[in-house]
Amino acid sequence: MGKEQELLEAARTGHLPAVEKLLSGKRLSSGFGGGGGGGSGGGGGGSGGGGGGLGSSSHPLSSLLSMWRGPNVNCVDSTGYTPLHHAALNGHKDVVEVLLRNDALTNVADSKGCYPLHLAAWKGDAQIVRLLIHQGPSHTRVNEQNNDNETALHCAAQYGHTEVVKVLLEELTDPTMRNNKFETPLDLAALYGRLEVVKMLLNAHPNLLSCNTKKHTPLHLAARNGHKAVVQVLLDAGMDSNYQTEMGSALHEAALFGKTDVVQILLAAGTDVNIKDNHGLTALDTVRELPSQKSQQIAALIEDHMTGKRSTKEVDKTPPPQPPLISSMDSISQKSQGDVEKAVTELIIDFDANAEEEGPYEALYNAISCHSLDSMASGRSSDQDSTNKEAEAAGVKPAGVRPRERPPPPAKPPPDEEEEDHIDKKYFPLTASEVLSMRPRIHGSAAREEDEHPYELLLTAETKKVVLVDGKTKDHRRSSSSRSQDSAEGQDGQVPEQFSGLLHGSSPVCEVGQDPFQLLCTAGQSHPDGSPQQGACHKASMQLEETGVHAPGASQPSALDQSKRVGYLTGLPTTNSRSHPETLTHTASPHPGGAEEGDRSGARSRAPPTSKPKAELKLSRSLSKSDSDLLTCSPTEDATMGSRSESLSNCSIGKKRLEKSPSFASEWDEIEKIMSSIGEGIDFSQERQKISGLRTLEQSVGEWLESIGLQQYESKLLLNGFDDVHFLGSNVMEEQDLRDIGISDPQHRRKLLQAARSLPKVKALGYDGNSPPSVPSWLDSLGLQDYVHSFLSSGYSSIDTVKNLWELELVNVLKVQLLGHRKRIIASLADRPYEEPPQKPPRFSQLRCQDLLSQTSSPLSQNDSCTGRSADLLLPPGDTGRRRHDSLHDPAAPSRAERFRIQEEHREAKLTLRPPSLAAPYAPVQSWQHQPEKLIFESCGYEANYLGSMLIKDLRGTESTQDACAKMRKSTEHMKKIPTIILSITYKGVKFIDASNKNVIAEHEIRNISCAAQDPEDLCTFAYITKDLQTSHHYCHVFSTVDVNLTYEIILTLGQAFEVAYQLALQAQKSRATGASAAEMIETKSSKPVPKPRVGVRKSALEPPDMDQDAQSHASVSWVVDPKPDSKRSLSTN
């Protein structure tokens, strides 16, 4: 490996003579080999033949020749980089040519799935891109995708490399391909303001304007970041300004992010100001109560437009006179000012020392850098450019910036936690833009004006998406339960026209009551940990007593230590990077596939502060494509606030210390005035709300209700056990609970639930891997010490016995009569979330299978058709008003006490499922998504778009499914609004629930479902076929989701539902005295094997292998209800 290591190093550093020398040994070796052929054949002459003859009979010479053999030109280092990767990334054109002449392959991917073409496109070197495409022994595939499903065109478009984009378009690169975040190259160019690239893509492919998703459009992305020219070009090209996504129209995005100029452009283009987002808010509603000056100006613009006036209040193009930044800091001590001047000087010295560096990849050129590029951070120039833009927003023209030949990649916006932790807002109210704005006064050099400064709002809190769940993150912008539920009241039960296709193959559905569903959260489903909902963000009663220490994320240190705090108070410089504006360091990931999963999901964390000489400190940024994470979500996303609230509680010491300062609130006001005056539109209200979470936890329930203006409900909450603010989180207090305790106003219920989302969730029992040592300590952690005696006297003396509790025992045995206390207990049981009717049946291990399976083959609603209820035991609580106490009043249903007695007498083994790889021979995964109990007693809810249904005249297995997917997808491309439904999956079938009013639309029995498959052209689209028992016709129902992982999980959950039904049937048949002669056969055919999408999967890995056209070669996955457990037969009901 010695010579190969030398070749890698020479290619990386561009040492052409070394590369040629090393590869000449390879040619020499090949010459000896050729002569050997002649010598061994007896006809070779000359030295070559002689050498070959000796080599064939002499082992020592053979060994000598092997020493002369050159290195493998396609060798790789620890990151999977070949010499060609290194040369392409670092722009060494001559080295690339030599490598290609020596048979270097262009189709070798590194560990992140990147090909040399990706790196050259990202670098912006059009010459190397041409070489890779047209030269070499292998044919470069221009549409090859990396692990993030990005093509070379994505890389070039994101960073504005117009020459590379031109070359790739000439080579017929597909511009409609989407990465893992469903972004096309046009989306990325619009997101980062790459105007020329946007024009080139639209000129080459005008149809890109119609290739939009419900998640975003190029217009939304450009409006969000204030790219005026890009917005204008898109509108001129014919993009619909009223196109709606989850966030509403582009006007919502521009207004929310304070882009006044874009708002004016959109209003002039005739954008409908009455469009509402998924929360039912118009753009005007979104900004009306925001406290920043810019938000008020935007609200005035929209109001003037609505009243038909031509704005006389139009925002003045020239910002109001700004006080000098030095004078704006009069409230800071002289010592602090001295520290700031010192920090500014050192920062500028550091900038000047690096002014000659070429771009954001300079660290990759250094000969001393390691081969593993994961650890490399880039330098200064990109951040310098972006901070120059921010300085412009402050009305100051930054100077000393040298022009660049190619546009730099956009600066990665600093996450809010980092910004607020690095610069204590009380004692260092300077942003990076303010620091740089002092530079002209120090250097006196000419300034450079730029047109746009789109990233000014990215310093505000909550502009990024933080997902703190596992790698299979489902990017649901909002949970279904967060939607407005007013429309659920008084529904007439009629099925909307757009859902009529779902009735094919559906069981009869009785009218559902007025109460909406509270759908179960699926085990694999996650919710973004962003900011609280808009309604909770705008409470005017939020006070200004928060601390200057920003609440850190879960992955960051919880509070500043005392030494750092002393440093702030005394004005003494500290070496910790948090106390200096120049150390805004971000996670580095140096190539297009370089972001790790945590980085991609937005859960960025800063490296632990290190003490370095200040001369070594640099503004660093991530080179990963994932810096768009901060730009793809707004501050109004639903929040899962548990971890954030927990970290807030850790800041109480720092809070108390800083609140002792008498000028604390006034200085916050001063800081907000400064930020507002420089036109950055920074909204501090959300940060204050997060910090105020600490104060909220110290309030009583009455004080908390008073803070949200609902103090009239204090007695109702207290009398029903909702008596502690620490235990009012979203996993305890739900809408049905508020109905039950007498809060009838839906607006008030929604307001209460929104406010409760900012409270911490009840921690699940054993959430940290350690169960409480005793029942008393567990109850004490829940604030329920009064029940200790009741638990112990009733035999619940260990944590294991507590885990087997259900609500019936809490009421009848333990006498926990208060609803809030019961909800608190059940919420702490991690494996059984309380989103079920009050009469929860025992866990599956406590129930005999045959007691359930008498209704397996019955229609889903058959047993309850006369009572007007659905037969699903555990659909969520909102469906029929808690089922009017369900089985307790159903004479046909056995009581839980009786079933528990049967279980004690005849204990059954817990249901065991075959793994997917055994249940389906071609399944690529090894485990199911859920516990069997989830599909038996509960339901798995998924949100999806319903594209429609199609009659299948000639059933050809999954081929019919895939054909229907393609046809329905094309037919709905131009639909402005696609209906949203919720799929509620159990072992009995699938229920379809209208997401807008939570009414059940249709039910498909498990026995009537077959041929579930993904669309091979769009893995977010899937479908299955049902059989209409009345007409014997087959219908294919087509759905789409916003995430490939979610689509995969839905199909896998359907497969698990078949497996559960199959195993239940087997156990029921075993338990009968006389076995049944035969059981009904159920078959479902999944798609061709679709490997589980991962961050590390390229598109080529997602493409199914070619197979024959028989049933098994279609990867049929059959869950067979058969008396023989080992039966391999598969009878189709089609």
From Swiss-Prot:
Free-text description of this protein's post-translational modifications in UniProt: Phosphorylated on tyrosine residues in response to EGF and PDGF.
Pfam families in alphabetical order: Ank_2 (PF12796), PID (PF00640), SAM_1 (PF00536)
Polar residues bias locations: 328-337, 572-588, 633-650, 856-868
Xref: SMART domains: ANK, PTB, SAM
Bias (Gly residues) ranges: 33-55
Record-listed Phosphothreonine modification sites: T318
Alphabetized GO MF terms: ephrin receptor binding
Subcellular location: Cytoplasm; Cell projection
Entry-linked CDD domains: PTB_Anks, SAM_AIDA1AB-like_repeat1, SAM_AIDA1AB-like_repeat2
Coiled-coil ranges per UniProt: none
Recorded superkingdom: Eukaryota
Positions bearing N-acetylglycine: G2
Domain PID: 936-1091
GO BP of this protein: ephrin receptor signaling pathway; neuron remodeling; substrate-dependent cell migration
InterPro entries assigned to the protein according to its UniProt record, in alphabetical order: ANKS1/Caskin, Ankyrin_rpt, Ankyrin_rpt-contain_sf, PH-like_dom_sf, PTB/PI_dom, SAM, SAM/pointed_sf, SAM_ANKS1_repeat1
Limits of the SAM domain: 696-762, 770-837
Composition-biased stretches (Basic and acidic residues): 305-317, 382-392, 613-628, 1123-1134
Annotated region described as Disordered, given as residue ranges: 33-57, 305-338, 375-422, 469-498, 569-650, 856-896, 1079-1134
Residue ranges of ANK repeats: 79-108, 112-141, 148-177, 181-210, 214-243, 246-275
One CC-aspect GO term: nucleoplasm
SUPFAM superfamilies xref list: Ankyrin repeat, PH domain-like, SAM/Pointed domain
Keywords: Acetylation, ANK repeat, Cell projection, Cytoplasm, Phosphoprotein, Repeat
Subunit note: Interacts (via SAM domain) with EPHA2 (via SAM domain). Interacts with EPHA8; EPHA8 kinase activity-independent but stimulated by EPHA8 ubiquitination. Interacts (via SAM domain) with EPHA6 (via SAM domain).
Function text: Regulator of different signaling pathways. Regulates EPHA8 receptor tyrosine kinase signaling to control cell migration and neurite retraction.
Full protein name: Ankyrin repeat and SAM domain-containing protein 1A
